[in-house]
Protein backbone atom coordinates (compact mmCIF):
# COMPACT_ATOMS: atom_id res chain seq x y z
CA UNK A 1 0.00 0.00 0.00
CA UNK A 2 1.31 3.48 -0.78
CA UNK A 3 -0.34 4.94 2.32
CA UNK A 4 2.43 5.11 4.93
CA UNK A 5 -0.16 5.59 7.68
CA UNK A 6 -1.38 2.06 7.02
CA UNK A 7 1.70 0.77 8.84
CA UNK A 8 1.00 2.85 11.97
CA UNK A 9 0.21 0.44 14.81
CA UNK A 10 -2.86 0.78 17.00
CA UNK A 11 -2.96 0.27 20.77
CA UNK A 12 -1.88 -3.37 20.39
CA UNK A 13 1.32 -2.28 18.56
CA UNK A 14 0.72 -4.80 15.76
CA UNK A 15 1.63 -3.81 12.20
CA UNK A 16 0.17 -4.92 8.89
CA UNK A 17 3.46 -6.23 7.54
CA UNK A 18 4.79 -8.14 10.56
CA UNK A 19 1.56 -9.36 12.11
CA UNK A 20 -0.63 -10.00 9.06
CA UNK A 21 1.18 -10.00 5.71
CA UNK A 22 3.98 -12.29 6.91
CA UNK A 23 1.57 -14.86 8.35
CA UNK A 24 -0.05 -17.74 6.45
CA UNK A 25 -3.18 -16.49 4.71
CA UNK A 26 -5.27 -19.21 6.40
CA UNK A 27 -4.36 -17.72 9.79
CA UNK A 28 -5.34 -14.21 8.64
CA UNK A 29 -8.68 -15.42 7.25
CA UNK A 30 -9.43 -17.29 10.47
CA UNK A 31 -8.50 -14.26 12.58
CA UNK A 32 -10.78 -11.94 10.61
CA UNK A 33 -13.64 -14.48 10.61
CA UNK A 34 -13.29 -14.65 14.40
CA UNK A 35 -13.32 -10.86 14.53
CA UNK A 36 -16.71 -10.82 12.79
CA UNK A 37 -18.12 -13.56 15.03
CA UNK A 38 -17.02 -11.99 18.30
CA UNK A 39 -16.41 -8.36 17.40
CA UNK A 40 -15.11 -6.28 20.25
CA UNK A 41 -13.53 -3.10 19.00
CA UNK A 42 -10.33 -2.15 20.75
CA UNK A 43 -9.62 1.34 21.95
CA UNK A 44 -8.18 3.76 19.46
CA UNK A 45 -4.71 5.25 19.66
CA UNK A 46 -4.80 9.05 19.45
CA UNK A 47 -2.27 10.78 17.23
CA UNK A 48 -2.15 14.46 16.30
CA UNK A 49 -1.07 15.57 12.84
CA UNK A 50 -0.40 19.07 11.52
CA UNK A 51 -3.17 20.82 9.62
CA UNK A 52 -1.73 22.22 6.38
CA UNK A 53 -1.13 25.96 6.72
CA UNK A 54 -2.36 26.13 10.31
CA UNK A 55 -0.73 26.06 13.72
CA UNK A 56 -3.37 23.72 15.15
CA UNK A 57 -3.24 19.96 14.92
CA UNK A 58 -5.93 17.52 13.82
CA UNK A 59 -6.63 14.50 16.02
CA UNK A 60 -6.56 11.13 14.31
CA UNK A 61 -7.87 7.92 15.79
CA UNK A 62 -5.65 4.98 14.89
CA UNK A 63 -7.54 1.66 15.10
CA UNK A 64 -5.72 -1.64 15.45
CA UNK A 65 -4.80 -3.43 12.22
CA UNK A 66 -7.47 -6.07 12.89
CA UNK A 67 -10.13 -3.38 13.36
CA UNK A 68 -8.95 -1.65 10.16
CA UNK A 69 -9.34 -4.90 8.22
CA UNK A 70 -12.87 -5.34 9.62
CA UNK A 71 -13.65 -1.71 8.68
CA UNK A 72 -12.39 -2.30 5.14
CA UNK A 73 -14.53 -5.45 4.81
CA UNK A 74 -17.63 -3.57 5.91
CA UNK A 75 -16.77 -0.65 3.62
CA UNK A 76 -16.49 -3.04 0.65
CA UNK A 77 -20.05 -4.23 1.34
CA UNK A 78 -21.62 -0.86 2.23
CA UNK A 79 -20.02 1.44 -0.34
CA UNK A 80 -21.90 0.21 -3.45
CA UNK A 81 -25.21 0.26 -1.56
CA UNK A 82 -24.67 3.79 -0.25
CA UNK A 83 -23.08 5.16 -3.42
CA UNK A 84 -26.16 4.13 -5.42
CA UNK A 85 -28.26 6.41 -3.22
CA UNK A 86 -26.00 9.43 -2.71
CA UNK A 87 -26.71 12.71 -4.52
CA UNK A 88 -24.91 12.51 -7.85
CA UNK A 89 -23.32 15.95 -7.52
CA UNK A 90 -21.75 15.38 -4.12
CA UNK A 91 -17.99 15.08 -4.53
CA UNK A 92 -16.32 14.88 -1.10
CA UNK A 93 -14.80 11.56 0.01
CA UNK A 94 -16.32 9.72 -2.96
CA UNK A 95 -14.70 7.10 -5.20
CA UNK A 96 -14.09 8.17 -8.79
CA UNK A 97 -14.80 11.83 -7.92
CA UNK A 98 -12.50 14.75 -7.26
CA UNK A 99 -12.34 18.54 -7.12
CA UNK A 100 -11.75 18.76 -10.89
CA UNK A 101 -15.12 17.07 -11.46
CA UNK A 102 -16.81 19.45 -9.02
CA UNK A 103 -15.29 22.45 -10.81
CA UNK A 104 -16.35 21.07 -14.20
CA UNK A 105 -19.92 20.72 -12.91
CA UNK A 106 -19.89 24.31 -11.62
CA UNK A 107 -18.61 25.49 -15.00
CA UNK A 108 -21.30 23.51 -16.83
CA UNK A 109 -24.13 24.88 -14.68
CA UNK A 110 -22.77 28.43 -14.92
CA UNK A 111 -22.84 28.31 -18.71
CA UNK A 112 -26.13 26.48 -19.26
CA UNK A 113 -28.48 27.91 -16.65
CA UNK A 114 -30.08 31.33 -16.51
CA UNK A 115 -30.03 31.28 -12.72
CA UNK A 116 -27.80 29.35 -10.42
CA UNK A 117 -26.65 29.30 -6.84
CA UNK A 118 -23.24 28.39 -5.57
CA UNK A 119 -22.93 27.49 -1.93
CA UNK A 120 -19.50 27.16 -0.43
CA UNK A 121 -19.14 25.88 3.06
CA UNK A 122 -16.94 24.17 5.54
CA UNK A 123 -18.71 22.09 8.12
CA UNK A 124 -16.68 22.87 11.21
CA UNK A 125 -15.66 19.73 13.08
CA UNK A 126 -18.00 17.70 10.86
CA UNK A 127 -16.82 14.28 11.99
CA UNK A 128 -16.91 15.30 15.67
CA UNK A 129 -20.59 16.29 15.52
CA UNK A 130 -22.22 13.31 13.80
CA UNK A 131 -24.92 11.84 16.03
CA UNK A 132 -24.52 8.06 16.17
CA UNK A 133 -28.24 7.38 16.58
CA UNK A 134 -29.19 9.46 13.55
CA UNK A 135 -26.41 7.86 11.49
CA UNK A 136 -27.42 4.30 12.40
CA UNK A 137 -31.07 5.15 11.70
CA UNK A 138 -30.07 6.61 8.34
CA UNK A 139 -28.13 3.44 7.45
CA UNK A 140 -31.13 1.31 8.40
CA UNK A 141 -33.50 3.36 6.23
CA UNK A 142 -31.08 3.28 3.29
CA UNK A 143 -31.26 -0.51 3.45
CA UNK A 144 -28.49 -1.65 5.80
CA UNK A 145 -30.67 -3.91 7.91
CA UNK A 146 -28.27 -6.66 8.91
CA UNK A 147 -28.23 -6.47 12.70
CA UNK A 148 -24.68 -7.77 13.03
CA UNK A 149 -23.32 -5.19 10.58
CA UNK A 150 -25.14 -2.38 12.41
CA UNK A 151 -23.81 -3.64 15.76
CA UNK A 152 -20.25 -3.69 14.44
CA UNK A 153 -20.63 -0.16 13.03
CA UNK A 154 -22.04 1.01 16.36
CA UNK A 155 -19.08 -0.55 18.20
CA UNK A 156 -16.67 1.17 15.80
CA UNK A 157 -18.37 4.51 16.33
CA UNK A 158 -18.25 4.21 20.11
CA UNK A 159 -14.63 3.06 20.32
CA UNK A 160 -12.94 4.97 23.11
CA UNK A 161 -9.56 6.62 23.01
CA UNK A 162 -6.67 4.95 24.83
CA UNK A 163 -5.77 6.92 27.98
CA UNK A 164 -9.28 8.42 28.15
CA UNK A 165 -12.08 6.88 30.21
CA UNK A 166 -14.90 7.95 27.93
CA UNK A 167 -16.96 6.28 25.23
CA UNK A 168 -17.19 8.18 21.98
CA UNK A 169 -20.73 9.60 21.75
CA UNK A 170 -20.45 11.61 18.52
CA UNK A 171 -18.80 11.13 15.18
CA UNK A 172 -16.84 8.35 13.57
CA UNK A 173 -13.19 8.44 14.57
CA UNK A 174 -11.10 10.57 12.22
CA UNK A 175 -8.59 8.22 10.68
CA UNK A 176 -10.96 5.26 10.42
CA UNK A 177 -11.20 3.62 7.00
CA UNK A 178 -14.98 3.66 7.07
CA UNK A 179 -15.34 7.15 8.59
CA UNK A 180 -15.60 9.19 5.34
CA UNK A 181 -18.27 6.83 3.97
CA UNK A 182 -20.28 7.09 7.19
CA UNK A 183 -19.93 10.88 7.17
CA UNK A 184 -21.32 10.98 3.62
CA UNK A 185 -24.24 8.73 4.63
CA UNK A 186 -25.02 11.18 7.42
CA UNK A 187 -24.59 14.35 5.33
CA UNK A 188 -26.48 13.07 2.28
CA UNK A 189 -29.82 13.75 3.96
CA UNK A 190 -29.06 17.46 4.30
Describe each PLM feature range.
Residues 1-25:
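Non-catalytic, polymerase-adjacent accessory regions of viral genome-replication enzymes
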Residues 20-41:
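Amphipathic alpha-helical blocks
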Residues 28, 43, 47, 85-89, ...:
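Conserved polymerase palm-domain catalytic core
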Residues 20, 53, 64-66, 95-97, ...:
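Short, flexible loop/turn elements at secondary-structure junctions
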Residues 51-77, 84:
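Hydrophobic alpha-helical hairpins/lids featuring a short glycine-rich hinge
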Residues 1-5, 76-89:
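Charged boundary/loop elements
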Residues 37, 48-51:
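Non-catalytic beta-strand/loop surface segments
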Residues 11, 76, 121-123:
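Residues immediately flanking
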Amino acid sequence: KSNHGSETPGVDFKTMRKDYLERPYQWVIQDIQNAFKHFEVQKIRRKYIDKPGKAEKRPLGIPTIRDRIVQECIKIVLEPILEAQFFEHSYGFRPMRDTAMALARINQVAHTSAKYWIVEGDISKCFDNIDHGILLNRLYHIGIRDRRVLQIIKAMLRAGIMDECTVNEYGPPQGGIISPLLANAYLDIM
